[in-house]
């Protein structure tokens, strides 16, 4: 299993940041390899489930995602299933008028699809993508 953790401080209140991330339709705006989010459905816990399409190493991978935990002003945890199995955690820490956002993901690289030789390269690319995700989030939330 691979993992990555990235943090960024956003000049916005926790509520604004968490509200933006709560809508899975926003994720392709900040996540470069996330091609599509569809079939979004509200869950009783205040989160959502959805289907997604993701591009990894030039291949299109599909699956589902579901928010399994949502604590206002604190964190949101999602599980993905399908071509990529993962647990994604967003944590939110107020810092005066700003919010420190940390994005952690634990995931399985789909070895049968991509091959063992590609695994190290994929992990490195995904780690860089984590930087882009939090920086894109900062740019969009601060601009709105």
Where are these regions (language model features)?
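Intrinsic-disorder/low-complexity, polar/charged segments enriched in Ser/Thr/Lys/Arg/Asp/Glu/Gln
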Residues: 3-9, 47-49, 62, 75, ...
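Beta-strand/loop substructures that line and gate deep hydrophobic ligand-binding cavities in soluble
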Residues: 79-131
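An N-terminal domain-start capping segment
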Residues: 1-12, 55-60, 130-133
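Hydrophobic ligand-binding cavity/cleft-lining segments
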Residues: 1-44
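Glycine-rich portal/gate segments that line the openings of hydrophobic small-molecule binding cavities
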Residues: 29, 38-84, 132-144
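Generic structural detector for well-ordered beta-strands
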Residues: 7-11, 53, 66, 79, ...
């Amino acid at each position: 299993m691979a993992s990555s953790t990235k943090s960024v401080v956003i000049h916005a209140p926790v509520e604004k940041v968490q509200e933006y991330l709560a809508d899975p339709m926003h994720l392709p705006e900040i996540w470069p390899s996330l091609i599509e989010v569809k079939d979004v459905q509200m869950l009783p816990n205040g989160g959502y489930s959805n289907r997604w399409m993701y591009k990894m190493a030039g291949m299109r991978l599909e699956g589902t995602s579901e928010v399994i935990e949502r604590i206002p002003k604190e964190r949101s945890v999602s599980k993905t299933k399908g071509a990529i199995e993962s647990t994604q955690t967003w944590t939110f820490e107020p810092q005066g008028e700003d919010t420190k956002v940390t994005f952690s993901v634990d995931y399985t690289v789909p070895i049968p699809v991509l091959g063992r030789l590609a695994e190290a390269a994929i992990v490195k690319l995904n780690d860089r993508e984590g930087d882009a995700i939090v920086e894109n989030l900062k740019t969009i939330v601060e601009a709105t």
